[in-house]
Amino acid sequence: MENFEKDKLQAAFKAPVAKPEYDPQAEPAVKVDLSICTDEERPRMVALINRLAKSEAGKETLEIAAKAGYKFGFLDASSGDAGTCFGSLHAVGLNPVVSDDKLISTLCHESRHAGQKNRMKDIPDRDLLDVASGVRRARAEEADAQAYAVVACKQLEMQGDKAPLTAFAESQMGVGTYAVFEKSLAEQNGVLNDKVLLDAFKGWYSHEGIQDIVKQLYEEVYILKPMRQAVQQFDEGNTDGVYTFNEKLSSKDLIQHIGWTGKGNYMAGEDPDFLDGEQYIGIAERTKQDADIFFRIRKEKTGIEKDTSIDAIPTYKDKFPRRFPEMESKPAVANEAEKAQPAQESDKAKNDKILTQGKNATADKWNAILAAKHLEKLGR
């Protein structure tokens, strides 16, 4: 998922949406499922696919996603994301309000996620992994998707289509990856080889631009959010299906899945333990503090021992003020009068609600499109 924090990462949306003419008769260069596109949306999606497919890296990601059965469509305009890969729906969605130039890298990024999900379907989900394994996996997935996106955009630039790379370089989400990528490419005399792709991957973890902020934002999503959900579940008296955080994923196994390409693994010659370095595995002080509180609460409620993988993870200073209350277990409401008191909703909670509503609206939109097409086939 790209640009999930609309307020923090809004620079990706600054470019005005172009209004080009799309060929209604054009067919996609890669045979993909466009069943969740309306007749009006289809020409634009075909144009985006065909533009990305002119790059070797872009075409590869599209072919893998298509082979895995992913559909391609546009998100509801209320979505806060530039693009999203819905593993559960087997769908890649793009935000229609974002410019075509920016959507090229987004399409590559989300298609790469589709391939990752397909290759890693036998690996435990992030919510089941211990904290250290979850951090490695989530960050590596984003770093790999961004690395592929910048390579695809560079390949297009080499053919004269410069706008996608410019849009990528100017987006806050792309700054770290792009800076390291261009430096490595120059050192390799302009040859786009595995070393450049690996360096672009590592660039996602750099301290360029807002990358340190991005890391902590993701920690709130893939570490703290499921923990908060579990605490809420405990407070409701339910301990069934609690997040266990006990499955392990080694750096070696992760790299074997993440670094795959049609020509081999671009990380094959790299010691996988680099993912355990402080820059790669470190988490914010607040993340560790809240996680420790969660494990204490969980032990009290369920008897499950703490996930000790978090103890060895180094920490860095928080990059922005606290947006959530401190992790805590709240006692059940004592009486009806207290129940009647309206809860104060934080700005972050309001933003999360908007994003959730946008995703629900997207699912409703796609279901409506599929239903209408089904009825049309039936002649109704």
Predicted features along the sequence, with ranges:
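Active-site recognition of the HExxH zinc-binding catalytic motif
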Residues: 104-118
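Extended, hydrophobic alpha-helical membrane-active domains that insert into or remodel lipid bilayers
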Residues: 116-134, 138, 380
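Auxiliary, metal-adjacent structural segments of Zn-dependent hydrolase domains
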Residues: 21-88, 100, 311-328
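Extracytoplasmic/secreted proteins, especially bacterial periplasmic and envelope-associated proteins
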Residues: 44-47, 56, 102, 106, ...
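Non-Sec secretion/translocation targeting segments of pathogen effectors
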Residues: 1-7, 11, 145, 327-380
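Post-HExxH zinc-binding segment in Zn-dependent metallohydrolases
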Residues: 130-168, 172-173
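Pan-zinc metallopeptidase signature
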Residues: 182-338, 345, 372-380
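Short pre-active-site segment immediately N-terminal to the catalytic Zn-binding motif
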Residues: 92-107
